[in-house]
Amino acid sequence: MPHRAASPAVSENEFDITGALFQNDSDSDNEQPSAKSKRQPPKKAFIAEQQTSANRKASNLKGRTVKKGGGFQAMGLSANLLKAIARKGFSVPTPIQRKTIPVIMDDQDVVGMARTGSGKTAAFVIPMIEKLKSHSTKVGARGLVLSPSRELALQTLKVVKELGRGTDLKSVLLVGGDSLEEQFAMIAGNPDIIIATPGRFLHLKVEMNLDLSSIRYVVFDEADRLFEMGFAAQLTEILHGLPANRQTLLFSATLPKSLVEFARAGLQEPTLVRLDTESKISPDLQNAFFSVKSSEKEGALLYILHEVIKMPTGPTEVSQQRKEEDASAKNLKNKKRKRAEMEKAVNTRESPTKHSTIVFAATKHHVDYLYSLLCEAGFAVSYVYGSLDQTARKIQVQNFRTGMTNILVVTDVAARGIDIPILANVINYDFPSQPKIFVHRVGRTARAGRKGWSYSLVRDADAPYLLDLQLFLGRRLVVGREFGDQVNFAEDVVTGSLPRDGLSQSCEWVTKVLDDNADLAAQRTVAAKGEKLYMRTRNAASLESAKRSKQVVSSDNWTSVHPLFQDETSNLEAEREKMLARIGGYRPPETIFEVNNRRMGKHENVDALDTIKRVRSTLESKKKPFSDEDDDVPTGVADNMSMASDSELEVTFSSYSKSKDNKAKKASAASFQNPEYFMSYTPNNTSLAEDRAYGVHSGTNSNFAQASRSATMDLAGDDGGRGFGEARTLMRWDKRHKKYVARQNDEDGSKGTRLVRGESGAKIAASFRSGRFDAWKRENRLGRLPRVAISGKRFRHRKEQAPKKADPLRGDYEKMKKKAELAKERAMSKAGGAAPRGKSELKSTDDIRIARKLKQKRREKNARPSRKK
């Protein structure tokens, strides 16, 4: 048999590999190669380029392996779920999904830090669908998702429906405002996934006496907002009813202390997942800090927007384009567009403008005031704060995301869940009281290799917080123009003042607007009152930074022009600024009474003059000790504060705390404790900067307590009060009972009515047990609902029939006859071996009575005489 020729097929890159394939495995040496292809062989350079591009994913040109990017296919998901993910449009998992999904699939409890828009909903929905797989006939839900608002719950339900399209999982939505009877029917329908708000779900749990022992997968979505809205008691009660072998997930934008305590109590050895990009300052971010006075903050904000950022006034280009499109659509008869044009329009609308700026304010009163002021100045502005209505909040954020507005004025509480993909600038109108809050604010810009700027307004009272931030970042402090041109805005903390001419014009414009607009002036008054409360409730700066800030503020460089305006300000302007600064800080050595007496030569009011001199001498004597202490501090403020190591901070803070008490110092010197062997109950290498801050470097978080300590951050409430997580002791007057009652009753929905203790010991409203579920069961003629973990009804064949008689016309008549006889015997043996039961011979009293009546009738009939013919 002749040997066949080798395969004529060539490789993908027209490279013949038959020789390599059949070199050692050929049957004979007489095998003839196939004819060459008519196409000419390509050049070697082209072959090398194709091979390099084919192998680029596995290795680079230097030979070192390249880490492959993990996709959804590498996570071990089912085929139906992968199809649903592809249908949804997810091609590559987001960073939070890539880090969270594998941990969840390993049945570990997770605390994830993610903002709204980062893909966190799919991060917990995809593993939930993969774990539940299909509908279970056993009674009881297996998945529970708790959301803070109705809108977020609807969004989660939509994602669950879309990703679970290839399964038969049943999901229900239980939120406030819907009919309780309809929700009773939903729960009675044995759903697999429950998406609810805490208040309504707790109401249904108490009303229906639900058994939550079947829950295996629990998600607390936007947990920080859940605690802020006063759902702590409801969450504790719900958590008490869940089984111990559940898997709990907690997603939040920030980690307040109360949330960390809740996670420690409700989660079992959780894993903290947070992105390094959310805890670092980008190296592409440039920072500028401007020293201003309290009365100049509005003018400084307007000057930064006009002169530094070059923010255009009037409607944005996107809003004008949309108005033109709407006008053209009305004129056109055919309003349908091509698919490509629609996608192009959507893509352009979903990107903010190049001037997009976020302005952070302290309270919601500041947000309202700045919104009105900036709108008066002609800017396109959006605003968001914590207590804003959810629909209005969504509209305002969407306008900023799509480029309808250029400026977004927010508070820290409201901005923690907002994710803006492209952001150019961040302005800190009110300087943050913690370094972590500053990192959280400015982390929204300079992403994905883009450049970004942050501008901060620093008053004299904010200088200690600025020094805390400088110590936390470990960067050099540059005050004014003391270093000349050698300034790096991305690596240094550069401070200085704004040019006086432009700032004065902006301040004059603000003063004029406040005089003309009474509503704006009233808003400023309210904001000032809110600021007083905010100042009392914000965290205090470190004592060492407060001490150093006095020297920094009193220096001449503090009021000098910022190096950012070096090209715009000449030397003459710099001298003018110095002269104005000296005039502004001038204090006369004598009062007007002393000057007049010296000029006129009179000696009136001698007692008053002596009192003034005595007070002045007393103040000067008190200033001398402080000046002596300041002499011990080196003159180079920036050099002294630029690179402070941990050992320096330890020595500085420990010596400062010990110098207050000389007796304690003597006692420690004469103490019997040997420092070489004595172990203190407190760590001796902690510094205040480390306690208030967290390590921004990446690392493994093996212990949740340690990891959460580095990520914990409490935000002050945007209404001027304390942040969530602290007990409110406010009372209100109850008109009906004529007494003061706790306002906590209003938050849990009881409105001052009676509270009862739940299963966990927490107080819940007594109105949750109203009896409506019992009435619903009576209306629908339902008895007791099936117990949890009991399977549903399954059909089983229990009917018994007599065997058919064998057909004598069939060929297997004898065989079928024997089968019928055997079936009869089995039926008789199953009945106890006796023959089929006949009519019982024992008569009852009724049978006997009836029989007697019938017999008597027969007798009477038979005893009648016969008829005569």
UniProtKB/Swiss-Prot annotation:
Q: Where is the Helicase C-terminal domain?
A: 341-495
Region entry Disordered: which residue ranges?
Answer: 1-43, 315-348, 792-869
Q: Does the keyword Nucleus apply?
A: yes
Family annotation (InterPro entries): DBP10_C, DDX54/DBP10_DEAD-box_helicase, DEAD/DEAH_box_helicase_dom, DEAD_box_RNA_helicase, Helicase_ATP-bd, Helicase_C-like, P-loop_NTPase, RNA-helicase_DEAD-box_CS
Q: Name one GO molecular function term.
A: RNA helicase activity
Q: Which Gene3D superfamilies match?
A: P-loop containing nucleotide triphosphate hydrolases (3.40.50.300)
Q: Which residues form the Helicase ATP-binding domain?
A: 101-273
Q: Which BP terms in the Gene Ontology apply to this protein? A: rRNA processing
Basic and acidic residues compositional bias: what residue ranges? 800-828, 838-850
Question: Which intervals carry biased composition (Polar residues)?
Answer: 21-35
Q: What is its EC number?
A: 3.6.4.13
Q: Which domain of life is it from?
A: Eukaryota
Gene Ontology CC annotations of this record:
nucleolus
PANTHER family the UniProt entry points to: ATP-DEPENDENT RNA HELICASE RHLE-RELATED, RNA HELICASE
**Its family?**
Belongs to the DEAD box helicase family. DDX54/DBP10 subfamily.
Primary role: ATP-binding RNA helicase involved in the biogenesis of 60S ribosomal subunits and is required for the normal formation of 25S and 5.8S rRNAs.
Question: What is the recorded name of this protein?
Answer: ATP-dependent RNA helicase dbp10
Q: Per the UniProt entry, what species is this protein from, by scientific name?
A: Aspergillus fumigatus (strain ATCC MYA-4609 / CBS 101355 / FGSC A1100 / Af293)
